[in-house]
Regions:
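Well-ordered mid-protein domain cores that form the structural environment of catalytic cofactors
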Residues: 1-54
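A short beta-strand motif characteristic of beta-propeller blades
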Residues: 4-13, 54-59, 112-116, 159-164
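A flexible loop/linker signature enriched in serine peptidases of the S9 family
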Residues: 11-17, 35-44, 59-64, 80-98, ...
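Conserved beta-propeller blade repeats
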Residues: 13-34, 61-80, 119-139, 159-162, ...
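Short loop/turn segments that connect beta-strands within beta-propeller blades
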Residues: 49-53, 103-107, 154-158
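The structured alpha-helical core of multi-pass membrane proteins
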Residues: 55, 73-74, 101
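Preference for long, solvent-exposed alpha-helical segments and helix-linker "stalks"
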Residues: 106-108, 114, 128-130
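Acidic/His-leaning functional-site neighborhoods
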Residues: 149-150, 167
Length: 187
């Protein structure tokens, strides 16, 4: 029989908290889920053991416009975060996001910066990991335009290299085979 894993109705008594995203670990044992307060774009991520329904101590704050993308070895996940707002939580302009990696069982303050670009404060990104774990692929956008850049990092490099470095269309990676990456475009 079907069971409810996460019930957003239990997040708050007044119903102002909502489910902002979910991501199940590759082994199917954990789920990262995001909670939003009052319709805000800000997300707080939590991690739950699916079998026991117990929350792990991992809490990720100041995430926005981001999913959680698990490492293939289930050790943690990637997410986009912003610096903690100084004053007006819902008014301050948020710039200079960082792509972070959170290792399960550690404090968010110890998360690793995977990518940032202070010269481009409006850029945002999403990451995908190739099935063979050979590539990390960044899709980089500027604002809400439906065009993106594509950067790739190989397992033998710490640097993301631009593959498509202009906003000339929409590019989505669909699969990898060996050293080849298939990209679908909409120009």
């Amino acid at each position: 029989a079907a069971e409810v894993l996460i019930d957003p109705n239990t997040f708050s008594e007044d119903g102002t908290f909502s489910l902002g995203g979910t991501s199940i670990s590759p082994d199917g044992k954990l789920i990262a889920y995001a909670v939003s307060d009052g319709g805000s774009d800000w997300r707080t991520w939590y991690v739950m053991d699916i079998a026991s329904r117990e929350l792990l101590p991992d809490v990720i704050e100041w995430s926005k416009f981001s999913g959680a993308v698990w490492a293939k070895d289930n050790s943690g996940f990637y997410y986009q975060r912003y610096d903690t707002p100084e004053e007006e939580l819902l008014v301050d302009i948020n710039e200079q996001p960082k792509l972070m990696f959170h290792t399960l069982g550690t404090n968010q303050i110890d998360d690793t910066i995977i990518y940032e670009n202070p010269a481009q404060p409006r850029w945002g990104w999403s990451i995908s990991i190739s099935e063979n774990n050979a590539y990390k692929i960044l899709s980089i956008s500027d604002g809400t335009e439906e065009k993106n850049r594509v950067y790739i990092q190989t397992t033998d490099s710490n640097e993301f290299l631009p593959v498509i470095d202009e906003l000339i269309g929409e590019f989505k990676t669909t699969e990898t085979r060996g050293r080849r990456v298939r990209v679908v475009t909409r120009l």
